[in-house]
Amino acid sequence: MRNKLLELIEAPQLRTDLASFKTGDNVKVHLRIREGEKERIQIFEGLVIKKSESGTREMFTVRKYSYGVGVERTFPTNSPSISQIEVLRSNKVRRKKLFYMRDRKGKSARLKEIRTK
């Protein structure tokens, strides 16, 4: 059980406007990037291989392949630089952390899709 005072302080800081997702989902993370005076949106699309849940310290890691090289990026869920998270596809997984996906490419990296009716 967590400290009640800590929960009371963290509750207003949690973001509720983002889509709910879990490990094994394919997501698009829309990031706000500031370059000098300008601001633009950059999209990072990939598979969620890790999600650690702990209030305001909640983090998730997304992995994708770019030009044949595996790229991983870790995001804080409650970060103001994340403008939107889109869930593209939900997959059936039995693990909370999918680090075994780092060794797989091509057909061996496929996951079974959960179809919604």
UniProtKB/Swiss-Prot annotation:
Listed Pfam families = Ribosomal_L19 (PF01245)
One annotated GO molecular function is: structural constituent of ribosome
The UniProt entry's GO CC annotations, sorted and at most eight, read: cytosolic large ribosomal subunit
Entries under InterPro entries matching the protein: Ribosomal_bL19, Ribosomal_bL19_CS, Ribosomal_bL19_sf, Translation_prot_SH3-like_sf
Cystine links in this protein are none
* Keyword presence, Transport: no
A GO BP entry is: translation
SUPFAM superfamilies hit by this protein:
Translation proteins SH3-like domain
- Superkingdom field: Bacteria
Q: Which UniProt keywords apply?
A: Ribonucleoprotein, Ribosomal protein
* Similarity comment: family membership: Belongs to the bacterial ribosomal protein bL19 family.
Q: What does this protein do?
A: This protein is located at the 30S-50S ribosomal subunit interface and may play a role in the structure and function of the aminoacyl-tRNA binding site.
Write down the NCBIfam families for this protein, in alphabetical order: rplS_bact
Q: Which HAMAP family match?
A: Ribosomal_bL19
Q: Which protein are we looking at? A: Large ribosomal subunit protein bL19
Instruction: Supply the source organism for this entry.
Output: Mycoplasmopsis synoviae (strain 53) (Mycoplasma synoviae)
